[in-house]
Amino acid sequence: MSLRRLAEHQPASFAFTPENQAWAEKEMTKYPAGRQASAVISLLWRGQEQDGWVTKPMIEQIAGLLSMPYIRVLEVATFYTMFNLHPVGEHLVQVCTTTPCWLRGSDAVVDACKKHIAPTPQTISADGKFSWMEVECLGACVNAPMLQIGKDFYEDLDGPLTEKLLEAFRRGETPKPGPQNNRRSSEPEGGATTLKEVV
């Protein structure tokens, strides 16, 4: 596993919005007395959804809410790669580069990200709209290569389709998730070859 550390530059403080604070307090009641620490992942996730990344002040705040030592919350945040430990752009592009996606051309997807976002991963684009990173399998191997933007999967990509996708996001559009090459779901690329009748 790679070494994961908090960003060098941190904000001065963190506070959940009133809505998220109420949500966090309710989330903690799902666990028996003395077991509120079980909510640590969901609270970190909610904090990341609020601010885009996990900060030291956020970890301190969550540790206080859950009556946990700071180091225990830090261990969770640095262990799970789903937590962003550095600032990210408005759109975080996560490119799958594991074997199925790589065999189907994820290198071209990475090259498009280098060209249209930043030459190195985990760097925010000059306009602040994007950052990108390579990730482990996202579970859409049948439609490889693919990437995730926000909570949506964009599949069956190549270099030009990835560039087109990023340009649409840059214009403020939200492209339709799923296959980008006109494939229907996970059917063969040329269309269904068996069981053609919909029952």
Protein language model features and the residues they cover:
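Signature of N-terminal electron-transfer/Fe-S-associated modules in redox systems
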Residues: 1-199
